[in-house]
A protein has these predicted regions:
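Long, compositionally biased interface segments
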Residues: 176-204
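Beta-strand/loop substructures that line and gate deep hydrophobic ligand-binding cavities in soluble
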Residues: 135-187
């Protein structure tokens, strides 16, 4: 089952119990790098409970500028078209809590969520990277669970390009038709990369 959001986001004043998938960097072949520099994306969906979806792209922009866009939570709908009404509702020592709505095509009703979000620089697979994690706050919204991450790092051989990987594991609490999975694969996932790229162009 699923939910995206971009992706993300998070809220509530409960002590969050974080789900797990450790952020990693997927190695790219030379052919994949060329395709991604031309605007392509790598996308994957794995059925299960939760459903797992991911997208990888390359953006010609500094990592720090892109990470700033990711952490500007109220502005997420400006570049993530499936996400609406994002609001910061609190913070604690570990998280910024945000809530929002993921717009899903008919016949699925929109998904609402609260999440715990945190981001910062880490070393991932030997690379200095920015990592943004998000986890659904149990018992909030109308989804069962959602958790995942973004990883951003500068390509060693092409430092002007930033590798962007988004992974989400999600169970929206309802069965997901095949048509919705196609929408995720062909629309929602690549839209995150193109939207982030366009938002950077607007701001910088």
């Amino acid at each position: 089952m699923i939910r995206f959001p971009l992706c993300f986001v998070i809220i509530a004043f409960a002590l969050p119990v974080f789900a797990t998938e450790d952020p990693t960097i997927r190695e790219l072949s030379a052919e994949e790098v060329t395709d991604l520099m031309d605007g392509g994306t790598i996308r994957d969906i794995a059925r299960g409970t939760p459903l797992r979806a991911e997208v990888i792209g390359l953006i010609e922009a500094p990592r720090d500028e892109l990470s700033t866009i990711l952490l500007d939570y109220p502005q997420i709908p400006e570049w993530a078209p499936a996400t609406e009404d994002v609001e910061v509702v609190g913070t604690d020592d570990e998280c910024t809590f945000i809530e929002g709505v993921t717009k899903i095509p008919w016949p699925i009703s929109d998904r609402t969520w609260r999440m715990c979000s945190r981001g910062g620089d880490e070393t991932i697979d030997g690379q200095e990277a920015f990592v943004y994690r998000f986890d659904h706050v149990e018992g909030t919204g109308n989804i069962d669970t959602s958790f995942g991450f973004w990883v951003l790092y500068s390509l060693p051989d092409h430092p002007e390009w930033t590798y962007v990987r988004y992974v989400v594991n999600a169970d929206p609490g309802i069965a997901i038709p095949q048509a919705i999975l196609r929408w995720v694969t062909n629309g929602a996932l690549p839209d995150l990369i193109s939207g982030l790229r366009a938002r950077h162009g607007e701001l910088y």
